[in-house]
């Protein structure tokens, strides 16, 4: 299941050093975390809007955009996707309420 996301992570890393005038990914990195975070937020809102409208096709497209921009944000933050998967694995089998209660406060 992660093969596509692994490939996307590699593509994002490769395009990071590209010319921002010819690469959307390079342009995002050139603008830094504020722009990347803004784009992630926009895609999250668009995903919610499509879901609330019952637009399955829209949800699919917006979810793809959301995952793409999340991967860009993770790269900018220096967080490998494998770390996110490891955290999900760690939480597997733990009640959501128990896991949330165990998180550090603050």
Curated annotation (Swiss-Prot):
InterPro entries named among the record's database cross-references: HisE (IPR008179), PRib-ATP_PPHydrolase-like (IPR021130)
Localization of this protein: Cytoplasm
Alphabetized GO MF terms: ATP binding; phosphoribosyl-ATP diphosphatase activity
Keywords: Amino-acid biosynthesis, ATP-binding, Cytoplasm, Histidine biosynthesis, Hydrolase, Nucleotide-binding
Classification via SUPFAM superfamilies: all-alpha NTP pyrophosphatases
Primary location group: cytoplasm
This protein's pathway: Amino-acid biosynthesis; L-histidine biosynthesis; L-histidine from 5-phospho-alpha-D-ribose 1-diphosphate: step 2/9
CDD domains referenced in this protein's UniProt entry, alphabetically: NTP-PPase_HisIE_like
Catalytic activity: 1-(5-phospho-beta-D-ribosyl)-ATP + H2O = 1-(5-phospho-beta-D-ribosyl)-5'-AMP + diphosphate + H(+)
EC number(s) stated in the UniProt entry for this protein: 3.6.1.31
An example Gene Ontology CC term for this record: cytoplasm
Top class in the EC scheme: hydrolase
GO BP annotations, alphabetical order: L-histidine biosynthetic process
TM regions (residue ranges): none
Similarity comment text for this entry: Belongs to the PRA-PH family.
HAMAP family to which the protein is assigned, alphabetical: HisE
NCBIfam families, A to Z: histidine_hisI, PRK00400.1-3, PRK00400.1-5
Protein name (Swiss-Prot/TrEMBL): Phosphoribosyl-ATP pyrophosphatase
Species assigned in the record: Rhizorhabdus wittichii (strain DSM 6014 / CCUG 31198 / JCM 15750 / NBRC 105917 / EY 4224 / RW1)
């Amino acid at each position: 299941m992660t093969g596509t996301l692994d490939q996307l992570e590699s593509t994002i890393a490769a395009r990071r050093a590209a010319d921002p005038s010819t690469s959307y990914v390079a342009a995002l990195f050139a603008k830094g975390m504020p722009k990347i975070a803004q784009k992630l937020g926009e895609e999250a809102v668009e995903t919610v809007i499509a879901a609330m409208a019952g637009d399955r096709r829209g949800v699919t497209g917006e979810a793809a955009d959301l995952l793409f921009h999340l991967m860009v944000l993770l790269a900018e933050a220096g967080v490998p996707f494998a770390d996110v998967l490891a955290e999900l694995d760690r939480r597997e089998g733990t009640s959501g309420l128990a896991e949330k209660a165990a998180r550090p406060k603050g």
